[in-house]
Amino acid sequence: MSRYLFSSESVTEGHPDKICDQISDTILDALLTQDPRSRVAAEVVVNTGMVVVTGEITTTANVNFTKLVRDKIREIGYTEADNGFSADSCAVFLALDEQSPEIAQGVSCALEVRTSEEDALDRIGAGDQGLMFGFACTETPELMPLPISVAHRLTRRLAQVRKDGTLAYLKPDGKAQVTVEYERKDGVDRPGRIDTILISTQHAAVIDDLSDNDAVQARIKADLQTHVIGPVFADLDIRPDAQTRLLVNPSGRFVIGGPQGDSGLTGRKIIVDTYGGYARHGGGAFSGKDPTKVDRSAAYAARYVAKNIVAAELADRCEVQVAYAIGVARPVSIFVETFGTGRVSDEALMLLVREHFDLRPAAILRDFDLCRLPAQRGGRFYQDVAAYGHLGRPDLDLPWEHTDKAATLKQAIQTAAAV
């Protein structure tokens, strides 16, 4: 038996890059709520005292972009001007254009339509070329890798204890990283123990009557053990042990944070958004993009495929790649890999995927109702996945997390085996 370490990180909603992702998806939610046909590519930059919203938007919706920006910043928790960034005092600059008519043509009128080789679902072409990956494994109940699952739990808990006043001295910016020791036996990898927990969290310079930084850091570490780490691991089978390293603010001090400490940009946390580096990534970001962009919708669909394969007990680990050409509806390739954990061959699974999953953009939009979900969910949907992961979210009802095809896949394999 061999052992190895694997690490994944997460960031809080107050991290500068995540502020941008959430603003981008708040704009997307508002536009799709009014006009489900909106074409959106909203990019955001934040820095000390400043927000820039740019990109390409084509819509009939009428929204107050500046108000959307300020409301989201306030919800995240940046309300004090002395942080160098606050909802009411930051400047908001808008620089928005319409979607390129050449790109719009390829999306609205796919190659299959232009060559008269189509059915109704061929009408929408992919918004760009690219490759997307989906993944699932049996390490957690939500079928996600353990390191990223625990890292997200930690950052969500950091935000919770800040907002509910349990640890009122915490500020919005923060990060967590979890290192898991895996055991490999007979070619099978299983998480064995938690090797390292790293938390960096922004905090007030003075906590109660403590002003000495060493005392402040000791208080933070003790509080995080009690109010964050303990509750996060309470319902997990794998927990920190006597040898687990706990690192809290190892840089020594974290008072200056958020956009005052670092600029932020939409789309810079794509590994945090997905599988924490445990699976491959095609490179395309999600936030700020309407669902006709396959960077987003096809990555969700690939996760759906992989999760249903694992839920059907056809594999313990499954990765699905799908690739597209701009303006073409049908994927140019589909690939399935189970890393030696499959109950049937990867080739058989690829045939199963082609038979039971329609991965054309219009079919993905239809099956998940991606353009109408914001209106159906009271005006907010995408902004809720813009922090703490787009995948493996038991706290949210996400259509790509459903395992409604697992029974069908299992039956199809059993039927084929009986022939």
From Swiss-Prot:
Its cofactor is Mg(2+); K(+). It is found in: Cytoplasm. Pathway: Amino-acid biosynthesis; S-adenosyl-L-methionine biosynthesis; S-adenosyl-L-methionine from L-methionine: step 1/1. Binds 2 divalent ions per subunit. Binds 1 potassium ion per subunit. One of its GO terms (molecular function) is magnesium ion binding. It is an enzyme of class 2 (transferase). It comes from the Bacteria. Its EC number is 2.5.1.6. SUPFAM superfamilies: S-adenosylmethionine synthetase (SSF55973). GO terms for cellular component: cytosol. K(+) binds at residue 43. It catalyses: L-methionine + ATP + H2O = S-adenosyl-L-methionine + phosphate + diphosphate. Pfam families: S-AdoMet_synt_C, S-AdoMet_synt_M, S-AdoMet_synt_N. Keywords: ATP-binding, Cytoplasm, Magnesium, Metal-binding, Nucleotide-binding, One-carbon metabolism, Potassium, Transferase. ATP binds at residues 15, 173-175, 253-254, 262, 268-269, 285, 289. GO terms for biological process: one-carbon metabolic process; S-adenosylmethionine biosynthetic process. L-methionine binds at residues 56, 99, 262, 293. Mg(2+) binds at residue 17. Residues 99-109 are annotated as: Flexible loop. Catalyzes the formation of S-adenosylmethionine (AdoMet) from methionine and ATP. The overall synthetic reaction is composed of two sequential steps, AdoMet formation and the subsequent tripolyphosphate hydrolysis which occurs prior to release of AdoMet from the enzyme. Homotetramer; dimer of dimers. Belongs to the AdoMet synthase family. This is S-adenosylmethionine synthase. It comes from Gloeobacter violaceus (strain ATCC 29082 / PCC 7421).
